[in-house]
Amino acid sequence: MPVPTTNVGLSDIAAEFGGTVPHALSEYYNNGSAPASGTIRFSHLAGESAGISLKAYGKVIDTNTNSTSYSGSLSASVAVGDVIVIAKVTGFGDFAQGTTTINSISGTVLSFDNEWFSPIYGMMLFEKVTATASASSISVSCSEGSSNRQGMYVFAWLIGGGATHDDTAASASTGTLTVDTGENGAIVVGGSYTDDSYAIPDLNGADFETTFNRDMHVWAGHTVQSGTAATSSMTVATTGSDNRIWSFIKA
């Protein structure tokens, strides 16, 4: 909309950015953080209705059970257009990706890494889908073919607000991802799969981890950036580790 010279109201902002009543400035401003004083800029109007948000995250599957198929769910309010990202890790079995559906959708594989440390072998896979229907949970189903897996771990992130994949970094030892977030913010997610159970990576202080099948160690984490350019880095052990970090921004 053209910016008026006087008397800008929340109704004008709502007409530009959408949203639901009752309206509040924090609904739109800088990912929900309106200042108590000082200058308010239209370039900062990128909150819940105009920017992206991390709506939910957590473990969907975490088991050492031998099987060729696994399933699990995470309670979450999924809306049409939300992006669901998963980190999927297997133990033993074989190096194949298997078949994974997320809320009954076959997703896009972002990365696929094999891991081997005698006698352990498996893989780590990142995948994403865009929700085509609303749901009350994130449901993941994994079909692993004829070779038994001796364990499965899946971690999921739900990103709302019309996100798109922006960039990636991957390394056997260190991954560093730089994102120019502009005014819309960014969400960076990552995961690591290593035989060194003492090497817990860190992604800007947001850590979740579990010990997985015979000393294999799985880690998943995220950080939410807001308003300024930022660098997110993840460091893991150099021995037998796979790691990935991904950023998502407003489409």
Model-derived features: positions:
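Primarily extracytoplasmic/secreted proteins
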Residues: G51-A251
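N-terminal low-complexity, intrinsically disordered "leader/linker" segments enriched in small/polar
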Residues: P2-S53
